Amino acid sequence: MNYPLHPRRWRAFVHVTLVAGVVGLGAISLPAAGEPEPLWAYGFLTPPAPGDKAAPQAPPSRALRPNEEAGEQTKLRQVAGSKASYSRVDVRDGGHVIDWFPEDHPLMTPIIANGPAAMGLLARGCASCHLPTGKGRPENAPVTGLPLAYFIRQIEDFRSGARQSADPRKPNTVTMAVLAKAMTDEEVRLAAEYFGAMPWTPWTRVIETDLVPKTRISGNLFLPIEKERTEPIAGRIIEVPEDEEQAEGLRNPRSGFIAYVPVGSVKRGENLVTTGGISVVDGKVVLGKTIACMTCHGPDLKGLADIPGIAGRSPSYLVRQLYDMQQGARKGPSAPLMQPVVANLNGDDLVAIAAYVTSLVPPPIDGGHGSGAGKH
């Protein structure tokens, strides 16, 4: 499918198409305020209590923490394929982002490596969370390959408060608002151009399963306690590092993730994503509960104009955004376009959609990494 329209005309076309879809559905409900929060997507085990809000994230620091041994924390380490050496203190210094593989991305500008200049020592570089490659992690956002206009609009939404989290405890939403307000327009543009210059490449392996490893949560990220799968998946998606030491301990941007998804969710998600959930009952076509995703995101779900690609991205992130939009936590200019898409979706629908979308662009078979969705 070619993109023949100016971005503004394309957005108008999408709006008309979605309105037509809503009319075809008959009606949509108001956002499902009573739909239970997918706690796993936000990295929590229990719902927020009244008045709960995010604790501010500590600024980057190289100081030793209680009970840390100096020699262990300052010992230089390496990862396979890299000529660089860094200590654990270097790894966690978000104001001076480490770079294992400079050949994998453009030259990092100060906003990427060090953060907003106006924040001084309190700043953290974009790559401290999203990594130099922009692939992000399950607890934050994959920002590589985003259209420039979309990227800039998200920063503006964080600045204005139009982009928030449906779970008020999510700390990096608060951090993003602080950083966005401190960034100059030039820094925003440089960050958008940096991440937008890189095409998205997948690194999440989807596995359908009834059982998952027992996990613990650190910084809203699930980490496996054991390799054996003994815990029922219970309708969740559990996204964990392929190698905890590489991904978490060393922030290796080549070490990806596994997304355990319920058996059958990829196939069910395919129907929701490609048709909106249309079915045939007694020979009659029954319209589904949503609108096909390619209406806006393109036939391969890799984006169109200033609408972002979603194929192959973190399922935890995808579910958070769908739920945030459903609950009205995202109020930016694009949010109204998504309302008819998410209004009637329940938790199982969100899981199925994310499982399928992530499985569309499997990571390459490399060093034992799998290449797509499968039941294991």
Segments from the language model and where they lie:
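Bacterial N-terminal signal peptides
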Residues: 14-27
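Flexible coil segments in periplasmic/lumen-exposed cytochrome c-class electron-transfer proteins
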Residues: 34-124, 166-292, 327-376
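Short acidic/histidine- and often glycine-rich active-site loop of Leloir-type glycosyltransferases
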Residues: 303
